[in-house]
Regions:
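Conserved NAD(P)+-binding/catalytic subdomain of aldehyde/semialdehyde dehydrogenases
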Residues: 64, 114-170
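Generic hydrophobic/packing signal
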Residues: 9, 25, 32-42, 66-72, ...
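Short acidic-hydrophobic sequence patches enriched in Asp/Glu that either
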Residues: 20, 99-103, 167
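Conserved small-residue-rich beta-alpha loop and adjacent elements
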Residues: 46-114, 161
Length: 170
């Protein structure tokens, strides 16, 4: 992982660990520690008109999540949202950036070894693959990247009223 990040971005092993792999490991540890409390039904306030009832909030997965990640923190910003999506009970399609090819290949290898394709799929490629993915229907889209591409993601998501998380940069 560190070698791929060095080849793609010139990151040292220390920076790779502190800014990418260490944070992913921390997120995995956090989710494993708290997943049962996150998945539990929570009792909430019931309006007076329904005084004979009890109200609950029950977490429920979206379904298939599309995760599109950027080139600058390719390991962290691909796997961090994936950890959360899987912990929430979703399946995922992961699209790492074409601009960090060595890291994208490591991500693809790791995910293919750890998950069956029906749970987590990896799509590599450039803009053509991004467009093909966005023309498909997903239940949730998590995108990190530029404002210009974020607008395109939002337009495609609007066709299906797909909820999105956009983490946009300059």
């Amino acid at each position: 992982i560190h070698l791929a990040l060095e080849k793609d971005l010139g990151k040292s092993a220390f920076e790779s660990y502190m800014c990418e792999t260490g944070l992913v490991l921390s997120e995995i540890t956090y989710m494993l520690r708290h997943i049962h409390s996150f998945a539990r039904e929570k009792r909430v306030w019931t309006p007076l008109a329904q005084f004979h009832s009890r109200s609950y909030k029950k977490p429920c997965p979206y379904g298939v999540v599309l995760i599109m990640s950027p080139w600058n923190y390719p390991f962290l910003l691909t796997l961090d949202p994936l950890v959360d999506a899987i912990a929430a009970g979703n399946t995922a399609v992961v699209k790492p950036s074409a601009y960090s090819p060595h890291t994208s290949e490591i991500i693809r290898t790791i995910l293919q070894e750890c998950f069956e394709e029906q749970y987590v799929s990896v799509v590599t490629g450039g803009r053509a693959e991004n467009t093909c993915l966005l023309n498909e229907h997903f239940d949730y889209i998590f995108f990190t990247g530029s404002q210009a591409v974020g607008k395109e993601v939002m337009q495609h998501a609007a066709r299906y009223l797909t909820p999105v998380t956009l983490e946009l940069g300059g």
